[in-house]
Structures are given as structure tokens and as C-alpha cells.
């Protein structure tokens, strides 16, 4: 079967030019970027469309040719695609739920360890020529993580990997999730309010939906300990950024580790850039070459299984049997 596959914005995942997309289909066309004006011409006759965090609106989907059977989001999050519009047009949408599990979990743990030692502050001090910490007591917070409580919001693949590593660090675990499991050793399932009140570190690992947008806001931030840190390696809009900045400025919480932001990249004037208690990274959790190669491999399997009538990783649409 010679199925036409179009990759609309490959540069988003292939920024170093090292990925091979030929495994997706014997007939694959790859574009670095695609504007909405270019879309119609580029997807004519396409069976499969691949995107990476590119907005795919209802208006765009309505204009898709009838040949389109599958939209593949080349990542875990799929809030960029109008799922209802795809469903109405009979188009299946799939994602890649676990390609970056290890790497993103490592990023979250790295942030916890970094913030516990104010590593970014100490590096800045040395870079500015302040060598006092070599000869006298530390002038920044420096705490152990063992025995501290980690609150994990969302217990999917990444959340559970974070829990596994945190348990190896002898951290206590609180979890808030829609799907708790019974009798899990060392894990205590609690309400969001209880988690925020009792955690020394809070790590976000849930998808961005209408119900989770700004779930961390002025009200929920006020529940946290003044000594607590919040970590977000999931989606920026889970946290009301303005409320977070206010909480940090007023000392309501101790700090934040953010690999994702509401607007990426943040505006140049965003206070998060210059806050000593913030560890800000450029959505790097998924960007390692090994991780991206795994992404393409799973993406190819998604397409293969779908076209053989056994769709996997479906987030919306019909259990479409390819003809």
C-alpha cells in the first residue's frame, strides 16, 4: 500500500537535520514549516498528516481533502489539534505518549536537585567573580531531598517514572490523579488541596485540557508552603504564569523549575528570566537526539498499525480501518 504522508513542520523536531523521515512511508513529503496559506496545496491527496505542536484548527480540518484519514501529532500533548472537528470529519488522531518518558522525568528530577542546592544561583555568583562560597559558609538555601515530600500531579508514564526515581532518593510521595491505583507501596493518593499543603516539591505531569488550564493559580499557590518549589515539565498553561510570578516575588513559595512556559519563548521582559529562585529552561526535556529518534520510530509504527487496521495511541476519532 503506497500511502501518501506529509510532514508539515519537520524543523520543530529535526532542528539539527539528523532525523530520517523515510521510515514513515514509501511516499513521504517533508516540509520544514507550513503556513495556513500553504496548507491546502501541500496536503492534496495525502492520507496521513504529521505535525509537531502546530495548531490544527477546526477551520483547517474542515478544508482537509477526503483522502486524509489520520493526523499524527509527533509528541505527547495534542491540545493543538481540534479533536472534535477531526472526529466529525472521520479523521483519527494519534499521539506518541511515551517516547520521552525517561528524558522528561530526568529533567524534572534534575530541577528538584538543582533547586534544592540553589545551583543556578551559585553558578551565577561564580560567573560574576564572587568566589566567597569557596572560603565561607553557603549564603544560599541548601537542603537535602531525602525525607522531603514530593507531590506528583498526574500519574501517567512520566509521572510514574518521576515517582520511581524520587523513591530511590528516599522521598515521600503524594499523588493527585484521576485514576488512583490501590495498594501501591510508598504512594499516598490525596486531593489536590492536600497535596499542595503538604508537599516540599510539586511536579506537574498532566495534559493540558480545559479543566487543567491554570489549575495552579493564585488560590492554589496560596496553599503551598513558603519553603516549597513547583516544577513544570508538562505544559506551560497548567500554571497561571502571572500568579506564579506574583507568588515568587512575594515569597509565597521558595522557587520554580520551568521547562515549559505559557508563551514559548517568553517575552524578553518576562521577570522569570532574572529571578534567582527560578530555573528556566527552553522546553528541552524532549530534545535529545536519542529521544527524537525514538519519536520517529514510534511515529512510523503508529502509521503502520493504523494502515493495517490496528490503530494504536488513538486520542480521538474512529477505529478507522484503512481500505
Task: Enumerate the predicted regions with their spans.
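N-terminal glycine-/charge-rich "phosphate-binding" loop or analogous flexible N-terminal tail
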Residues: 1-48, 174, 307, 322-323
Amino acid at each position: 500500500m503506497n500511502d501518501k504522508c506529509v510532514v508539515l513542520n519537520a524543523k520543530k523536531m529535526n532542528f539539527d537535520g539528523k532525523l530520517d523521515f523515510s521510515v514513515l512511508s514509501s511516499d513521504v513529503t517533508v516540509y520544514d514549516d507550513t503556513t495556513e496559506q500553504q496548507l491546502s496545496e501541500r496536503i492534496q491527496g495525502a492520507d496521513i498528516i504529521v505535525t509537531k505542536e502546530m495548531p490544527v484548527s477546526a477551520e483547517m480540518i474542515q478544508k482537509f481533502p477526503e483522502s486524509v484519514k489520520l493526523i499524527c501529532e509527533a509528541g505527547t500533548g495534542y491540545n493543538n489539534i481540534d479533536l472534535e472537528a477531526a472526529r466529525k470529519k472521520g479523521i483519527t488522531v494519534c499521539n506518541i505518549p511515551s517516547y520521552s518518558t525517561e528524558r522528561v522525568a530526568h529533567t524534572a528530577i534534575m530541577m528538584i536537585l538543582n533547586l534544592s542546592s540553589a545551583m543556578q544561583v551559585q553558578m551565577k555568583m561564580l560567573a560574576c567573580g564572587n568566589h566567597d562560597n569557596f572560603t565561607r559558609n553557603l549564603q544560599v538555601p541548601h537542603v537535602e531531598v531525602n525525607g522531603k515530600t514530593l507531590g506528583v500531579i498526574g500519574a501517567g508514564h512520566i509521572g510514574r517514572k518521576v515517582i520511581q526515581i524520587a523513591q530511590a532518593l528516599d522521598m515521600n510521595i503524594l499523588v493527585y490523579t484521576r485514576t488512583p491505583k490501590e495498594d501501591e507501596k510508598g504512594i499516598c493518593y490525596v486531593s489536590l488541596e492536600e497535596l499542595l499543603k503538604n508537599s516540599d516539591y510539586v511536579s506537574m505531569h498532566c495534559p493540558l485540557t480545559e479543566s487543567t488550564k491554570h489549575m495552579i493559580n493564585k488560590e492554589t499557590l496560596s496553599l503551598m508552603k513558603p519553603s516549597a518549589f513547583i516544577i513544570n515539565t508538562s505544559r506551560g498553561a497548567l500554571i497561571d504564569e502571572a500568579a506564579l510570578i506574583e507568588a515568587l516575588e512575594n515569597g509565597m513559595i521558595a522557587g520554580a523549575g520551568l521547562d515549559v512556559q505559557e508563551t514559548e519563548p517568553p517575552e524578553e521582559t518576562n521577570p522569570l528570566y532574572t529571578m534567582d529562585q527560578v530555573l528556566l529552561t527552553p522546553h528541552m526535556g524532549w530534545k535529545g537526539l536519542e529521544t527524537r529518534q525514538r519519536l520517529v520510530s514510534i511515529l512510523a509504527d503508529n502509521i503502520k498499525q493504523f494502515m493495517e487496521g490496528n490503530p494504536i495511541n488513538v486520542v480521538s476519532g474512529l477505529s478507522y480501518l484503512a481500505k
